[in-house]
């Protein structure tokens, strides 16, 4: 099967979030299963290519009664995956991928409409796939275009479209007047197609026109069909619930494993847990703290309400009075950056905070912490809780999205489970759950059993790739009904 991925970012070439990790990993896992895989992504200013070659010299894209000419660069084959880069410097030769600290780029609709057109036109020359696998709003026009403007093009008669939602909170909303600028017909601006409260919604268009929709955990696939998590599109998703599936993200264990991690002070495994104490001591030194027998609770996160920082705001001073040390790495909303700085200043022996992102330090926190706190309001999949399992760092999570799918609550009677979960989104419920974990930590036999349970779990990309293949096979048997 030939699968073509289309996404706005992809490791190792560009990254702002988890989308890039998925688009960097799933194609490789599919190629390892014997499939032909290509990836289309923009050529940004900071994209580094070793031996770039022009694959398609000139693609014509109509815009506002004019034509834009872009090219596609051949990025070569990596681990069995062919990489192509859409090159249009006026749109992609910029300091950042989507915007400045002040806000999004004003022409993001045009930028990613051009990208979507270029992928379709480029595939006519480079090879139309059996499956177009598109990701998030930046490539959401591909399903729309293929089922409208390209519906009569025989080149795409047999191509199917799978669309993956990584986060419903980002939908690609633009003024209705953008449609003629993008040379898209006004009849798309209806309630059953792309209109959304007076705006054009790119994500909605993909949900309407794709043959199959996936998201990044089973629980999140159900949650987004409810008003609480659907961000206004729950009705669209419920209307096609038979072609919506959740597939858990995997983890690259060559990068995230305590047995091989190049960033940590001491390597360890489930059979040699004693060495983890050296990583704990190294982590405390990194933050200028003395060695201690108290449990260390790690947090690596964007500082935002979605990530549960409003709960930490509610009970932060009470957390600081617990017999634990909280080690925090991240950045984000100024309100929560200020909160973290205050807690670290007021309770220097209980809260250690680094307002930044540092990949090496993130590894040290995973390896050196005893627990890892992720109290998210919603979490499509989440990766840090999966990393934590492999490092024997016990997750404390809210039971939502991928956090609920990946963490099994500890049962002291059966000694089963991999972490601690709370259901109610409240500071009190979170605090109670942290206290349960701190209490169990005193029982070293039970705690080591809990650690080893988590370390035995396998969330490799190979498992996810096989599930995607099953979705592709289903997509080949269906076709999204045309909206009226």
UniProtKB/Swiss-Prot annotation:
UniProt: ADP-alpha-D-glucose binding residues: 15
Cystines in this chain: none
SUPFAM superfamilies from the UniProt entry: UDP-Glycosyltransferase/glycogen phosphorylase
Matching Gene3D superfamilies: Glycogen Phosphorylase B
Pathway, per record: Glycan biosynthesis; glycogen biosynthesis
Domain of life: Bacteria
GO molecular function terms attached to this record: alpha-1,4-glucan glucosyltransferase (ADP-glucose donor) activity; alpha-1,4-glucan glucosyltransferase (UDP-glucose donor) activity
EC number: 2.4.1.21
Top-tier EC class: transferase
Reaction catalysed by this enzyme: [(1->4)-alpha-D-glucosyl](n) + ADP-alpha-D-glucose = [(1->4)-alpha-D-glucosyl](n+1) + ADP + H(+)
GO biological process, one term: glycogen biosynthetic process
Keywords: Glycogen biosynthesis, Glycosyltransferase, Transferase
Stated family: Belongs to the glycosyltransferase 1 family. Bacterial/plant glycogen synthase subfamily.
Protein name as it appears in the record: Glycogen synthase
Natural source organism: Koribacter versatilis (strain Ellin345)
Upper classification of the organism: Bacteria, Pseudomonadati, Acidobacteriota, Terriglobia, Terriglobales
Encoding gene, per UniProt annotation: glgA
């Amino acid at each position: 099967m030939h699968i073509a991925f289309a996404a706005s970012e992809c490791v190792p070439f560009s990254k702002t979030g988890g989308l890039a990790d998925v688009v960097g990993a799933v194609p490789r896992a599919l190629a390892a299963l014997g499939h032909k895989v290509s990836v289309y992504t923009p050529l940004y200013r900071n994209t580094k290519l070793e031996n770039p070659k022009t694959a398609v010299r000139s693609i014509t894209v109509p815009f506002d009664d004019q034509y834009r000419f872009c090219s596609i660069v051949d990025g070569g084959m990596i681990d069995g995956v062919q990489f192509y880069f859409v090159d249009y410097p006026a749109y992609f030769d910029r300091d950042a991928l989507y915007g400045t600290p002040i806000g999004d780029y004003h022409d993001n609709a045009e930028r990613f409409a051009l990208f979507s057109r270029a992928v379709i036109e480029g595939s006519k020359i480079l090879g139309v796939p059996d499956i177009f696998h598109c990701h998030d709003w930046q490539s959401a026009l591909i399903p729309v275009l293929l089922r409208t403007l390209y519906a009569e093009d025989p080149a795409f008669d047999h191509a199917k479209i799978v669309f993956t939602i990584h986060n419903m909170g980002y939908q690609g909303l633009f003024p209705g007047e953008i449609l003629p600028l993008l040379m898209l017909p006004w009849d798309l601006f209806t309630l059953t197609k792309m209109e959304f409260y007076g705006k054009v919604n790119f994500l909605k268009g993909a949900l309407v026109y794709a043959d199959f929709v996936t998201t990044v955990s089973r629980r999140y696939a159900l949650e987004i069909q409810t008003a609480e998590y659907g961000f206004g599109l729950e009705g669209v998703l419920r209307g096609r619930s038979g072609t919506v599936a959740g597939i858990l993200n995997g983890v690259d264990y060559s990068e995230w494993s305590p047995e091989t991690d190049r960033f940590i002070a001491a390597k360890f495994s489930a059979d040699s847990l004693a060495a983890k104490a050296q990583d704990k001591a190294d982590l405390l030194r990194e933050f200028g703290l003395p060695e201690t027998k108290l449990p260390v609770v790690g947090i690596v996160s964007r500082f935002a309400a979605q990530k549960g920082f409003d709960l930490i705001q509610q009970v932060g001073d009470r957390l600081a009075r617990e017999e634990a040390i909280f080690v925090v790495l991240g950045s984000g909303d100024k309100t929560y950056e200020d909160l973290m700085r205050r807690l670290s200043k007021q309770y220097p022996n209980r809260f250690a905070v680094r307002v930044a992102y540092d990949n090496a330090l993130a590894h040290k926190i995973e390896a050196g912490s005893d627990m890892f706190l992720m109290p998210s309001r919603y979490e499509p999949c989440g990766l840090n809780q999966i990393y934590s399992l492999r490092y024997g760092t016990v997750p404390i999570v809210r039971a939502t999205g991928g956090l609920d799918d990946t963490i099994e609550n500890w049962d002291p009677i059966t000694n089963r489970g991999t972490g601690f979960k709370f259901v109610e989104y409240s500071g009190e419920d979170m605090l109670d759950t942290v206290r349960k974990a701190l209490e169990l930590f005193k029982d070293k036999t039970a705690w080591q059993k809990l650690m080893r349970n988590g370390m035995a779990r396998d969330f490799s990309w190979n498992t996810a790739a096989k599930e995607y293949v099953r979705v592709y096979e289903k997509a080949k048997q269906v076709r999204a009904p045309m909206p009226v």
